Amino acid sequence: MKKFLIAILLLILILAGVASFSYYKMTEFVKTPVNVQADELLTIERGTTSSKLATLFEQEKLIADGKLLPYLLKLKPELNKIKAGTYSLENVKTVQDLLDLLNSGKEVQFNVKWIEGKTFKDWRKDLENAPHLVQTLKDKSNEEIFALLDLPDIGQNLELKNVEGWLYPDTYNYTPKSTDLELLKRSAERMKKALNKAWNERDEDLPLANPYEMLILASIVEKETGIANERAKVASVFINRLKAKMKLQTDPTVIYGMGENYNGNIRKKDLETKTPYNTYVIDGLPPTPIAMPSESSLQAVANPEKTDFYYFVADGSGGHKFTRNLNEHNKAVQEYLRWYRSQKNAK
C-alpha cells in the first residue's frame, strides 16, 4: 500500500512538473517575436482551425515553428476567438500581440476620398486605383452602373442613364474584399438622403420642377465657386435667371459638354456651338448634373439668398463680384481684365 501511495505521489509530481513546464513553454511562446515586414497584411479565412492557423503563421514566415500554437489555444481558450478578416501587422511584435489582434476583429481599413466638384469619370479612376478593393465594375458602362445603383425616378430622363451628380462626396472607409459597387451604393444612398432633405426644406418659390433639377443646379453652383459663403449668392443668380427665362450662360456646363475636346480654353466658337450642355445656347438647365455637388451646394440651391443679382464675374481674389444688370456686369468684367493684365505684366 505504501509503495502504491508513493507511486501515485510520484505520478502527481511528474504530471505537475509536466504541466508546469508546459505552462512555462506556453508563456514563453506568446513572447516569441513575430517576423513582420513593412505594411504586411494577414488574411484569416472563415473556419480556420488552430492547426491551420499554425501552418499559416509558418507559411507567412511570421514564426519559425507553430506547433505549440494549437496547445496554447487549448490552454487559453480566450485567445481562440479569432475572427475572419484581413489585418495590418504594423504594430504586432509578439505572438501575444498577433493573437490579441486576431481576436479583436479590428480589420485594416483603407479609404477612397471623393471630392466635390469632380465628375463620375474622375471618381471611377479613384475606384480603379483604390488598394485592396475588389473591382467588379471595370468593364461596366456608365449605363450599366446606373442600373446597378437603383437610382430613383425623380425627374431624370432615364434614357440618359447618367450617374453624374448622384454620388455624395466624402471619404469612404472600406476593408479588403469590399467591392467598388458597395462603395458606390453607400455614396448614392447618402446623396439620395441629402437631396431629399434639401428638397423638403426648399423655398416654395423655386423655379425647379423636381429634385433632379435641384441636383443639376447644385452641380453648377459647385463648379462655379469653391467659397462656402458664396454658394447661396451664386445660386440666387441662377434662380433669378431661371425665373426671368434668361439663359444661364455658365462656362462649366460648356466645358462639360465639350468633353475630351476641352483643352483648358473656351473659345467664342465653343460658346456658340450647340450641345445639350451649352447654356449659352440652350434654355434652362442642362439635361444632367455636370459634377458631384456637395451637400452645402444642395442647401444653397434649396435656400438661395434673396438678391436681385443676375450676373457675376471673378474678382481676382478667388471670389466673385455680383451685379444687377448687363451694364454693371460689363464694368465688372473690365475691372477684372485690368487686374488680370496687371498681374500678368508683374511677372
Curated annotation (Swiss-Prot):
Top enzyme category: lyase
Gene3D superfamilies found in the cross-reference section: Classic Zinc Finger
Location(s) in or outside the cell: Cell inner membrane
Cross-referenced Pfam families: YceG (PF02618)
UniProt KW NADP keyword: no
GO biological process, one term: peptidoglycan biosynthetic process
TM region positions: 4-24
E.C. number: 4.2.2.29
Positions of the record's site feature: Important for catalytic activity: 224
Lyase is among the record's keywords: yes
Family to which the UniProt record says this protein belongs: Belongs to the transglycosylase MltG family.
Annotated protein name in UniProt: Endolytic murein transglycosylase
Source organism (scientific name): Haemophilus influenzae (strain ATCC 51907 / DSM 11121 / KW20 / Rd)
Organism lineage: Bacteria, Pseudomonadati, Pseudomonadota, Gammaproteobacteria, Pasteurellales
